[in-house]
Amino acid sequence: MRIRRFSLLATVAAATLTLTACGAGSAEPGASNNADTPQNADLTVQVADGSEVTLEETPQRVVVLDYASLDTIDAIGAGESVVGVPQKTLPESLQQYKDTIDVGTLKETDFEAVAEADPDLIIISARQADNQKKFEEIAPTINLATDTEHFIDSSITRIEDLAAVFGKQDAVSDKIDALKTQVDELKSTAEKAGPTLFVMSSGGKLSTYGPGSRYGFIFDELGFTPAATDISNDDGHGQEISFEYIAEKNPETMFVIDRDAAIGKSGKAAEQVLDNKLVNSTTAAKNDRITIVDGVNWYLVTGGLNTLPSLLSELSDSLK
C-alpha cells in the first residue's frame, strides 16, 4: 500500500460580523496601518450566540486564540496588531508570532497572560467558548466558532468580516474570488473519488467523520460521496471505528488526519496504524487513494485565508 502525504505550509463561521464605521483618526505609532478604515470607528460585531460586541475603534492590540483567525489576520497584513497567541502548538506557517505573549494553549488559557497583554480585542473559537465570560472581563471578545453546516460559506464570510474589522477589504477580494472558483472546480470533480471515508488517527486509534460533522463539508458542500452514512456526529473527535469497519465499507478514497503529528504528540504514525491486512484489502489502498492530509492545517488552522485554499488543493490533488 502506498499512502500519499501532503504537507502544505500555506496554510467561519458561526459568527457573522455586521460592521458599521463612523468617525476618523490616525494610527498610533507602531500600530498597524489600517488605511481602508478609520482608526476611531464604532464597530458592532454580531457573534456566534447572536449577541453584539461594540468596538470603539479599530483594534490595535489583539489576543488571538483561534489559529484560523490568526492565519487570516496574517494573510490580510494586519499581523502587527497581534500581541498574544497560544505558543505550544503554533504552526510553522505562523512562527512569525512566536515572540508575542504566550497566552496558554488552545484548550487551557493563561488568563493572567491575556490580561498582561492589555488587548482591546480577544478572538476565540469553539475550543475556548466555555470561558467567554472570563475573556469578556478583560476585553471585548469575539467567538468565531466554525459553522460546520455551512463551513465554506461561513469561512468566507469570516474572512471578509475580519478584513473589514482591520480595514483590509482590498487585501481579500481577489483571493476570495479565486477561492470560490476553486470550490466550484472541486465540486465538479468530487464524484470521481467514489465512496469516501474521512478518518482521524490519534493515539493508535481511528475515528471517522460523515455528513454533518466537523469535516462533513467535504460531503455536504463539496460533493464527495460518503462511504458510510451510519456515523454518529455527536463527538467533535468523530466516531471511533475499527479496521474491520474500514474493510466492510471498502472506500475507494480515504483522507486521513494524523492528529498526533498535528499537535506534536509522540505515537505511531498514521501510515503505520493503517498498514495492515484489513485496510490494505480496500479499493482505496489497492489504487493508492489513501491520502494523509496536512494535519496542522486540517486540525488546528482549517478555515483561514491561507489555509482554506490549501485544504481544497489537497482534496483536488488526491483525485489526479
Label every model-predicted segment.
Residues 252-320:
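Structured C-terminal subdomain patch of bacterial secreted/periplasmic proteins
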Residues 203, 207, 235-263:
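Ligand-binding pocket segment of bilobal, Venus flytrap-like solute-binding proteins
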Residues 138-203, 301-320:
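Extracytoplasmic substrate-binding proteins
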Residues 2-67, 170-198, 259-270, 293-296, ...:
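Bacterial Sec-exported substrate-binding components of ABC uptake systems
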Residues 47-50, 103-111, 233-241:
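Short helix-initiation/N-cap motifs at beta->coil->alpha
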Residues 118-124, 140, 246, 250-255:
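Proline-aspartate-enriched helix->loop->beta-strand connector
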Residues 89-90, 208-239:
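Alpha-helical, coiled-coil/dimerization segments enriched in small aliphatic residues
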Residues 61-116:
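A short, structured surface patch at a secondary-structure boundary
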